[in-house]
Amino acid sequence: MAADIGRIVSELISFRSLLGKRVLSVGAGGGQFVGLYREAREVVALDNDPSALDALRERVRLEGLENRVTPLLGDLLLLPEGEKYDLLLFEFSLHEMGDPEVALKKACTLASEVLVADHDPSSPWASLVGEREKVARAWRGVRNRGALLEVAHGGEQIFSSKEELLRRVAPLGPEVQDNARVWAEREGLRIPMVYRFALLKGLSGS
C-alpha cells in the first residue's frame, strides 16, 4: 500500500517547518512520517499501540535518528502539563481521539503551536474505511478552536492487488472489507485521498 508519504512529508514541511523545534508527535506509531523528524531538534513520538511503536523504533533505527527521536507509549490526555513543546503534531490521529475537542484543548496546554494533519470528510478513502463521520467531527473541533492557517491537498492510496487492499482494511471489519472489494471491482486499485493541514495557536489553559 502506498499513499505517497514522501509527498505528504514535503507538503507538511512546506506548511510548517520543524527546524530546530522540540516536537510532540501524536499517533506516531508505525513511523510513516519519520522523514519529517529529520529537521527537528527533538521528537517525542507518542502512540498507545506497543506494536506500532516497535515499527516506529525500527524505522528510526534505519534512518539513524535514535538520538533525536524518543518513542513513548501513552495517552495524550494523561501527559503531565509540565512538559512543554514548540509544536505538537497530530499525525492523521485526531479523528481517532474519543473527543477531538478535549484532545485539542490538552494539546494547546503542551505546545506553542498545534499542527493537525488528517483526512478530509470529502475524501473517498475516508468514506471507504468508514471514518467520514469521525473525520468530520475532528475538523469541527479544529474550527471551533479557530485555525490560524488551513490548507487542503489531494493524493491517492495505491495498491498492487485487490488482496493487498483487503489485507490493509481487514482490521476495520467485514463491512469495510465489502466496501473495498466493491471499490476494487468497479474503480480499480487507486483510491483518491483528500487531506488537510491546520495550524492552531497553543500554550493556553483552555
Language model segments and positions:
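A short acidic, Gly/Pro-enriched loop at the edge of an enzyme's catalytic core
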Residues: 77-87
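Conserved class I S-adenosyl-L-methionine
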Residues: 115-141
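Conserved alpha-helix/loop element of class I SAM-dependent methyltransferases that forms part
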Residues: 2-21
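Class I SAM-dependent methyltransferase SAM/SAH-binding core
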Residues: 24, 29-78
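A short glycine-rich, Lys/Arg-flanked "PGG" loop and its adjoining helix->strand segment in the class I
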Residues: 101-114
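Conserved acidic residues
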Residues: 21, 41, 86, 112
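Conserved Class I S-adenosyl-L-methionine
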Residues: 30, 137-206
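A short SAM/SAH-binding and catalytic strip from SAM-dependent methyltransferases
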Residues: 87-99
